[in-house]
């Protein structure tokens, strides 16, 4: 328990840099860097909200496919091609939800997520780390990594007014390419325009 409290304190101090104070917040990518992004390669698949209930578009990296066996209308799972029948395949899921926080209240949203994760980790030997940054699209992003030794779960929360997109990587193999695939999905996510 003492280890979790120390990690939590370090995480709160680390995440404090994502506040409203312009001198300590992470730098948002410039408009130029957002517009200079590469289009998905022919081997990648761009998914739009017309394909599912997720209100946005994103790119599924080459070598990954939808897991029909695990996906639902509100949460889509992806696994590496050829691993559908593995006992514990690395997987990436995407889910969009609503919350009671405006974008200006993102720190309260972050604190609620930390509290929820700590409740879920009660009694589990794990290390929790957190970070705050921006996606390549310029959206606020909170990243929480839960290391249980043999399983590493990384949660990427892309934040907007009264909502979020959670892309979660569950990494059983320790593969760095799996981590990169999840981050590529996060950075490619674009909210549908509301109107």
Predicted feature locations:
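N-terminal targeting sequences that direct proteins away from the cytosol to non-cytosolic compartments
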Residues: 6-8, 18-77, 170-195
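Short, well-structured beta-strand
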Residues: 139-195
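Soluble non-cytosolic domains of exported or imported proteins
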Residues: 103-108, 176-180
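Secretory pathway targeting signatures of secreted, lumenal, and periplasmic proteins
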Residues: 57-103
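Signature of long, low-cysteine stretches enriched in small and polar/charged residues
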Residues: 112-158
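Repetitive helical segments and hydrophobic/amphipathic motifs
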Residues: 11-12
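Bacterial N-terminal signal peptides that target proteins for export
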Residues: 1-5
